[in-house]
A protein has these predicted regions:
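Surface-exposed cleft-lining segments at the edges of enzyme active sites
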Residues: 34-36, 115-118, 141-147
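Bacterial N-terminal signal peptides
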Residues: 8-16
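Structural motif corresponding to alpha-helix initiation and N-cap regions
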Residues: 41-45, 73-74, 124-125, 151-154, ...
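Metal-dependent phosphoester-hydrolase catalytic domains
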Residues: 116-117, 147-151, 159-170, 176-248
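Active-site beta-strand/loop signature of hydrolases that rely on acidic residues for catalysis
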Residues: 25-32, 47-71, 138-141, 157-183, ...
Length: 248
């Protein structure tokens, strides 16, 4: 009888211990061709429709215009944010046509802190956009067309993210390189690819190239992908949007 009572006490105590629940999040990366579709129409609502279909928590956008002549002074990230109900964070990489051309993050909640870091780019300057959301850090980038510049981006990326060594880190974007390249081999010494390395994302109609990626920093209890989706065929951009479900 006494044994039974102690057993019940122990079981009750165990039931009262809170369990650590894994966090789940959907991420998307999307090169939006400055907001202009393959039909040469500026239609941010079409891009927003692609985003809303997946309902990601955070979206990394590349080739994002702000106040340029070719889009008649519009702020592309802001227009898409308005259609999706998300918060826009912008990083201009270069001055262009009276405005800026760069990258952006859309998020369901505003980041707690934002950092903009220049990256190597000889044909045009490149940028790393870092958003701290508390439990995790999400970054957006659009890497150089030149392999040497891409290689030289890795030390900068590692140095910047060292600040967040106690947080889970995700980097998304158009890396302008293939999964089996020398650059990706070097990058994967420090980062794990969460997206597919065999499913192409460019061009939009009949994809043949894998150049858009979602990666995470290697380490103990690193995040893992639980699902992925690539939407093919939309004229909203020349790239396909890539979504990855992650657990961390």
């Amino acid at each position: 009888m006494r044994y039974t009572k102690w057993l019940l006490v122990i079981l009750a105590a165990l039931l009262c211990v809170p369990t650590l629940q894994a966090r789940r999040m959907k991420l998307m990366t999307y090169n939006i061709h400055h907001g202009e579709g393959t039909d040469r129409k500026y239609a941010p609502e079409r891009i927003a429709k692609m985003i809303l279909a997946e309902a990601p928590e955070v979206v990394a956008l590349q080739e994002v215009d702000s106040a340029t002549q070719r889009i008649k002074g519009r702020y592309v990230a802001g227009d898409i944010a308005q259609h999706t109900g998300m918060h826009a964070t912008y990083a201009g990489a270069i001055p262009f046509q009276g405005g800026k051309y760069g990258i952006a993050l859309l998020s369901k909640t505003a980041p707690k802190a934002v950092t903009r870091i220049p990256l190597p780019g000889r044909e045009e300057k490149r940028m790393l956009l870092v958003a701290d959301f508390g439990p995790c850090v999400v970054c957006c980038t659009h890497l150089s067309l030149t392999e040497e510049d891409r290689m030289n981006s890795i030390p900068t990326l590692r140095k910047v993210l060292k600040k967040y060594r106690h947080k889970k880190v995700f980097v998304m974007g158009d890396f302008n390189d293939s999964p089996k390249s020398a650059f990706m081999n070097e990058l994967c010494r420090h980062f794990q690819v969460l997206s597919s390395t065999i499913t192409p994302t460019f061009p939009n109609d009949v994809p043949t190239e894998v150049i858009d990626f979602v990666i995470t920093r290697r380490g103990t209890n690193q995040p893992r992908a639980t699902g992925m989706h690539i939407a093919v065929g939309s004229v909203a951009s020349d790239h396909c949007p890539l979504s990855v479900d992650v657990e961390y």
